[in-house]
C-alpha cells in the first residue's frame, strides 16, 4: 500500500471515490434532489480541486501501487470547524475517512487514521475532532477503538435534510 498526499491531478479520481463511498453508505437516506445538491457541492471535481489547493485542508490517499487507482482517502483540516465545542486549545479536524466499498476491512482506514493522528501531533494539535452520523454504528466503533468519544450533538445538512450527528473528539 502506498500512502501519499493528494495533488491537483487527483481531483477527478478523488471526487469519484468520494461520491461512490458516500452513496454506497448513505444514498438510501436522502431524496434524489437533496443528494444531487450535496454531491455537487462536496464532490464535484471543481469542489475537490479547490480543497486540494487550500493550504488549510490536507488530503492523504492510498493506492496499491503508483497509478493503480485510489483505494481510500482522508480529508483533514488544520483547524477544526468544531473548535467551539471543546476546551482544546488547538483542535485538528478530520473531515472524511472513506474507503472504496469493495476494500473495507483491509486496514486502509486504520493506516489513514494512524497517519492523521501522527500528522495532528506533528502540527502541535491537542485534539482531533470529527463528526459521525448518529446511526453509523460501524464508524462509531472504529473511532472509539482509537479513543474518540462523543462531546456534542451537531447537525449535518444534505440538501434540505438535516441529519443528527455526533461530534467525537480524541485528546492528544
Q: For each predicted feature, which ranges?
A:
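Short coil/turn segments at alpha/beta junctions that flank glycine-rich nucleotide-binding fingerprints
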Residues: 106, 123-126
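Acetyl-CoA-dependent GNAT
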Residues: 5-9, 16-28, 36-102, 113-115, ...
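C-terminal "cap" of GNAT-fold acetyltransferases
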Residues: 60, 90-92, 126-129, 133-140, ...
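Short helix-adjacent coil turns
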Residues: 9-10, 107
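Extreme N-terminal starter segment of soluble prokaryotic enzymes
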Residues: 1-3
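Active-site acidic-Proline motif in GNAT/NAT acetyltransferases
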Residues: 100-102, 106, 134-135
